[in-house]
Amino acid sequence: MELTVGRVVKAHGISGEIVVEIRTDDPAARFAPGNTLRAKPSRGGPERSCVIESAREHGGRLLVRLAGVTDRDAADALRGTLFVVDSAELPDIDEPDTYYDHQLEGLQVRTTGGQRVGAVAEVLHTAAGELLAVRDDADGAPREVLVPFVSAIVTAVSLDDGLIEIDPPDGLLDL
């Protein structure tokens, strides 16, 4: 499975640096000098490999220099490009109750009372914490519920069973 670790926002300056929106929990490791990332152009076209020459933090994003990208025009051509890695390349997580987003996406969600809520469509990362975007199309009318990914609400996660159990406070599931 492919995981997006960054997206090129725009060129920065005239020497070929790019501004990258971070989409990984470990940007220092992913964008370390010498690393090679797969780049998927936003406008179609073939994937290419990009070697990181340098990366530094800048306003919550990264300024990245890639091998072979030496001017603003070449950097501008990368706008919208996604940097991806294969999920098989990710290290195992040793911390309990810690997951990669792709492990949670697709899991079924139900309440402790057995009521089906839907399936995790996406994990949203906000300043206040993570939210599970849970979608359900069972009744013909699609609905989405945002569930805070906190231990007070998420009581159990079973990757083996493909299930997340929640104990929602009153009103959380009401539309």
Curated annotation (Swiss-Prot):
<keyword id="KW-0143">Chaperone</keyword>
<dbReference type="InterPro" id="IPR056792">
    <property type="entry name" value="PRC_RimM"/>
</dbReference>
<dbReference type="GO" id="GO:0006364">
    <property type="term" value="P:rRNA processing"/>
</dbReference>
<keyword id="KW-0690">Ribosome biogenesis</keyword>
<dbReference type="Pfam" id="PF24986">
    <property type="entry name" value="PRC_RimM"/>
</dbReference>
<keyword id="KW-0963">Cytoplasm</keyword>
<dbReference type="GO" id="GO:0043022">
    <property type="term" value="F:ribosome binding"/>
</dbReference>
<dbReference type="GO" id="GO:0042274">
    <property type="term" value="P:ribosomal small subunit biogenesis"/>
</dbReference>
<comment type="subunit">
    <text>Binds ribosomal protein uS19.</text>
</comment>
<comment type="similarity">
    <text>Belongs to the RimM family.</text>
</comment>
<dbReference type="GO" id="GO:0005840">
    <property type="term" value="C:ribosome"/>
</dbReference>
<dbReference type="Pfam" id="PF01782">
    <property type="entry name" value="RimM"/>
</dbReference>
<comment type="function">
    <text>An accessory protein needed during the final step in the assembly of 30S ribosomal subunit, possibly for assembly of the head region. Essential for efficient processing of 16S rRNA. May be needed both before and after RbfA during the maturation of 16S rRNA. It has affinity for free ribosomal 30S subunits but not for 70S ribosomes.</text>
</comment>
<dbReference type="InterPro" id="IPR009000">
    <property type="entry name" value="Transl_B-barrel_sf"/>
</dbReference>
<dbReference type="InterPro" id="IPR011961">
    <property type="entry name" value="RimM"/>
</dbReference>
<dbReference type="GO" id="GO:0005737">
    <property type="term" value="C:cytoplasm"/>
</dbReference>
<dbReference type="InterPro" id="IPR036976">
    <property type="entry name" value="RimM_N_sf"/>
</dbReference>
<feature type="domain" description="PRC barrel">
    <location>
        <begin position="96"/>
        <end position="172"/>
    </location>
</feature>
<dbReference type="InterPro" id="IPR002676">
    <property type="entry name" value="RimM_N"/>
</dbReference>
<dbReference type="InterPro" id="IPR011033">
    <property type="entry name" value="PRC_barrel-like_sf"/>
</dbReference>
<protein>
    <recommendedName>
        <fullName>Ribosome maturation factor RimM</fullName>
    </recommendedName>
</protein>
<keyword id="KW-0698">rRNA processing</keyword>
